[in-house]
Amino acid sequence: MSQPVASPPDQTAVEKSTMRKISIRLVPFVALMFFINYLDRTAISFAAPNGMNTDLALSAAQFGFASGVFFIGYILLEVPSNMALHRFGARRWLSRIMVSWGIVALLFTWVGNFEQLAILRFILGVAEAGFFPGAILFLSLWVPAKHRSKTLALFYLAQPLTTVIGAPLAGLLINQHGVFFGLEGWRFMFLAVAVPAIVVGILAWFVLSDNPAEARWLSTPEKTWLIAALSAERAATEAKNAGTRKPRGGLRTAFGSGRVWALSAVYFGFIYGLYTLAFFLPTIIGGFEEQFGTTFSVFERGLITAIPYLPAAVVLYLWSRHATAHGLKPWHIWLPALIGGLSIPLALSAGSPAATVAVITVTACAIFAALPNFWTLPTQFLTGAAAAAGVALINTVGNLAGFSAPYITGALADWTGNYHAGMWVVGAFMLASAAIMLGLARRGRADSGLPGAGTTSKILD
């Protein structure tokens, strides 16, 4: 008797099982790395109103400068770091980055003055350089384009959840004043949030795989499908690019692309709003006592700081699911920018703490709704070394806002005595992001000549 021939595995079932494993095995760990990354980066915002600014005699402008100078170090090594990741592999490079910044973050425990704080923030930026774009690039090397928006949404959930969990946690740690080795509460907080970076960074060496072919947790059919899907996408993108431009190196391709620079400008506006809230929201909430006559404990201020970010996490996920289900459109990006730009200037004119937090919540939801969808765009028209350079360049230009936002906001607060002017600047930059994204959408429709064009694929063709 002849033996029955085994039928090939159903491709739909293989695709589902592969993406399920990636969503369970890979994405949560990278999201955990991002959670710790954002917590260490913004821990200074929790320390500032809870003893650090007083102990170090910092003005609002000095605090803003120390917060923002992180991004100067970050920017200087951003592109080289991401090119190194492309060369050495994500497992080694992301692990190295994480352990490095964890060691630097520990040193904040013993900072003694403004100068030391600024120097450490700069070095922390150098140590962290390349992590975020490297993580984005790493996920793009694992996840086909049709699944990328949802995957990046799961990854990006770590950022608002960092504040949801991290702000109350920081309050609890700061309340341990003098309990551990006589350290002030804010110093102990710096110590406690730095250690996980070192531990998880070491674990990353063993948990991550550089590419699907090395993943022991994927079956042979799953590896075959995933490698074929990613290779087909890469070949299609390279063929399209080959027909429109002469072959160039990765850096030249990225730096010579008008689309990369336009997306960099869009990202700048979002990041300006993101880090203004990240670094100054705890201080703004601390000012409710003077503004509204309210009194909150350190832990209660942490809980209030977390309030805008829980709805933001929900909106982020639902907005990205909508984009995945119905196709990513330009308005998935420019509409949140428009809403955020119109809402944030009104926040500090509200007549109560509840109203102020409610308006800030709208702005936070707008910022986080757009970001995961935004990061699906660069890898639609860049591959290989050009993708590494392009993602890093966009993140670098955007992170100029990471320096300018806290410094300008702090300087304006010192000058005017409040944060109103700083919020108007946030609104202006976010409205500019909306306008640029609308311009890209119109260009896409004009170039395609098709009714209803202007999806992101047409924008970037």
Show where each model-derived region lies.
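Glycine-rich segments within core transmembrane alpha-helices of 12-TM secondary carriers
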Residues: 152-174, 196-197, 395-405
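C-terminal transmembrane helical hairpin of 12-TM major facilitator-type secondary transporters
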Residues: 327-377
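Extracytoplasmic gate region of multi-pass secondary transporters
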Residues: 45-46, 252-320, 371, 375
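Helix-to-loop junctions at the C-terminal end of transmembrane segments
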Residues: 77-89, 314-328
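Conserved MFS/SLC helix-loop-helix module at the cytosolic interface between two early adjacent transmembrane helices
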Residues: 76-115
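Cytoplasmic membrane-interface "Motif A"-like loop-to-helix N-cap segments
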Residues: 86-98, 324-337
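Cytoplasmic helix-loop-helix junction between adjacent transmembrane helices
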Residues: 120-157
